[in-house]
Design a protein with these regions (language model features):
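Boundary/junction segments of secreted and surface-exposed precursor proteins
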Residues: 1-9, 582, 595-606
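A generic structural signal for beta-strand entry/edge sites
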Residues: 90-92
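An often Trp-containing, charged/polar helix-loop segment at the C-terminal end
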Residues: 412, 456-462, 512-558, 562, ...
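Long, low-complexity, intrinsically disordered segments
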Residues: 232-235, 239, 588-606
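Non-catalytic alpha/beta scaffold blocks inside enzyme catalytic domains
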Residues: 395, 402-439
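Walker A/P-loop NTP-binding active-site region of P-loop NTPases
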Residues: 507
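Ser/Thr/Pro-rich low-complexity tandem-repeat tracts
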Residues: 172, 177, 215-217, 581-587, ...
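Substrate-binding/charge-relay-adjacent region of secreted/lumenal peptidase catalytic domains
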Residues: 2-85, 94, 99-184, 189, ...
Length: 606
């Protein structure tokens, strides 16, 4: 037995609902990921920008030490294990061996259990451990994380389907009346004062199948109805003359898949060519449609592609484990050339992660910032509790809580498509109906970043301490006003902050195209000199609603961050010098957004 010392931060929470699934085959060969220390800390000035480094510079200055890699390799070999791959820049080493040998090398005991799937139905069968790990004494301080021994699911997809009950609450006798629904505004054969009554507008008659482009039109009075991503981008005044040309959007998926037929059906319906979409397998995972997570995958690709149709997409598929998650992100960030932006719509309550997993993943996000790659992450769909089974307690979602990513919260967006104006935008909150709310709050583990120091981040609800505030930005997320997408050959409305991460990724691709810039960590540029209670340039300030423990108000808040985007104004703010076609940057209030009336296509008759 090797001389072992504890690995700090490797403790895993005990699963109270795990059930034994029989005997684990300890002779089975598996692969784990070791994360090594940096040769030097990435300077804050490099993370904050605007300067960036190349992959070669990052590897040489902030990657793993060559001597450390050699020592880990020799130590693993002495223990009967095999180093199968090494990535100096991302500081990862892949080590294979039998379960018995790996358990002995890292001081743990593994069992086989079943536990409930995260964000889905059914049970997952996986290896399981509780307590902490150890490492050979010679590697103390060199190996900072050992991932993959316990392969429990770690994240849930942050998307929500429109329910019949939710649809029936928005299209009611109070919102659709003889005064708003007339022969002049809607075809009398489809919707009339005689057909819209308390008896006809019910959860049984108003469903995702009945709320379609043929039944909901812009001529009707503005109401809470599903939209296309193109319409959302238009209401948010995404910069004219941009489409993502020359940019790459990387998308991280931990399950599910997409079909080309779904993409072709969706984009042809919008009058767009299907963008370049390439599936990239990580550690043996692959594009696997026919699973519950298909809705997540299709939503991400379709929203990003609709708002940035000329951007190339690389969709990374990995197993839903901490090992799979970090390997996918590292592969996306450290590819050559690096992507413009990485979109992540998966996460889990911050307290459910091991410290070593959070720290290792946050390190990759710091790499992204140094390389000029922006990372957009969904802030969660369960309000301030970040727990789908409870509204008590407060937690933020990780990886959205990392200070090196752009955390994306949720709103309910109602717009007048005739005038291309936002008529109402409030915090998304349907918690009382068990239908989700935008995540937000204050981190328990990440300190307050410098760029949030003056915006009024509160103390954690029920506490006297503060930390990194979540989210940074927001966008349309309520399934009632969500996004019409195609999944398994059927058009359906889907929402959740899962939609906001790719929406912002598409916007950033367009901003990068317009400015020729790599934005990296966007927050220093968008927070700038914003102070508590003040609106930020380039944003629609959301001031109504709450997500449970936190309420919206003027300026940054823990429900919608700085607000939803006012794209053209944001471009002006981020441009140096500003484009000739833009005006003085302003913070656009939600009641008076600007923008041209869009060209009308069939999909704008929603």
């Amino acid at each position: 037995m090797p001389d072992l010392v504890p690995l700090p931060g490797s403790e895993r929470t005990q699963l109270s609902n795990a059930q034994s699934a029989g005997q684990l085959n300890e002779s089975e060969t598996i692969t784990v990921t070791l994360v090594l220390r940096r040769r030097a800390r990435v300077p804050a000035a490099l993370i904050l920008g605007p300067e960036t480094v190349t992959h070669e510079e990052l590897d040489a200055q902030y990657g793993a030490e060559t001597d450390d890699i050699a020592l880990v390799t020799s130590t693993m070999t002495e223990l009967g294990l095999t180093v199968t791959d090494t990535h100096q820049g991302s500081r990862r080493m892949m080590v294979s061996g039998t379960i018995a040998a790996l358990s002995a090398a890292f001081g743990t005991t593994l069992t086989l259990v079943t536990s409930p799937q995260l964000g889905g139905t059914g049970q997952a069968t996986h290896r399981y451990r509780s307590g902490g790990l150890s490492v050979p004494a010679s590697l103390a301080g060199i190996v900072t994380a050992v991932l993959g021994l316990d392969d429990r699911p770690v994240a849930r997809p942050q998307f929500r389907r429109l329910t019949a009950a939710a649809a029936s609450r928005t299209v009611t006798p109070e919102t659709v009346t003889p005064e708003t629904v007339t022969p002049e505004t809607v075809t009398p054969e489809t919707v009339t004062p005689e057909t819209v009554t308390p008896e006809t507008v019910t959860p049984e008659t108003v469903t995702p199948e009945t709320v379609t482009p043929e039944t909901v039109t812009p001529e009707a009075a503005p109401a809470a109805v599903p939209l296309t991503a193109v319409q959302v981008a238009s209401l948010y005044d995404f910069p004219a003359g941009t489409d993502g040309t020359g940019q790459t959007i990387a998308i991280i998926e931990l399950g599910g898949g997409y079909t080309k037929s779904d993409l072709d059906m969706y984009f042809s319906g919008l009058g767009l060519a299907t963008p370049s979409v390439t599936a990239v397998g990580v550690d043996g995972a692959s594009n696997s449609p026919g699973q519950p997570a298909d809705g997540e995958v299709e939503l991400d690709i379709q929203v990003a592609g609709a708002v940035a149709p000329k951007a190339a997409q690389l969709v990374y598929f990995a197993d839903n484990t901490d090992q799979g998650f970090i390997n996918a992100i590292a592969m996306a960030v450290h590819t050559t050339p690096p992507p413009t932006v990485v979109s992540i719509s998966w996460g889990q309550s911050e307290d459910q992660w091991s410290e070593q997993s959070r720290t290792a993943m946050d390190g990759v996000f710091a790499d992204a910032a140094a390389l000029g790659v922006t990372v957009t992450v969904a802030a969660g769909d369960n309000g301030s509790s970040d727990d789908p089974n409870s509204t008590s307690g407060v937690h933020v979602d990780f990886p959205a809580s990392s200070p090196h990513v752009l955390a994306c919260g949720g709103t309910q967006l109602i717009g007048d498509l005739n005038t291309n104006t936002i008529t109402s935008e409030v915090v998304w909150n349907e918690l009382e109906n068990n239908e989700g709310a935008g995540g937000g709050g204050v981190s328990d583990v990440f300190p307050l970043p410098s760029w949030q120091a003056n915006v009024g981040v509160p103390t954690i609800a029920g506490s006297t301490s503060t930390g990194r505030g979540v989210p940074d930005v927001a966008g349309n997320a309520d399934p009632v006003t969500g996004y019409l997408v195609v999944v398994d050959g059927k058009q359906q409305p889907i929402g959740g902050t899962s939609a906001v991460a790719p929406l912002w990724a598409g916007l950033i691709a367009r901003l990068a195209q317009a400015t020729g810039k790599k934005f990296g960590l966007l927050q220093p540029q968008i927070y700038g000199s914003v102070t508590e209670g003040a609106a930020a340039q380039g944003f629609n300030d959301i001031t109504e609603g709450n997500n449970g423990a936190y309420s919206a108000g003027p300026g940054w808040d823990a429900t919608t961050g700085l607000g939803s985007p006012s794209g053209q104004a944001l471009l002006t703010h981020l441009s140096d010098p500003p484009p000739a076609s833009t005006s003085t940057p302003t913070s656009t209030p939600t009641s008076t957004p600007t923008g041209k009336k869009p060209k009308r296509h069939w999909w704008q008759r929603l």
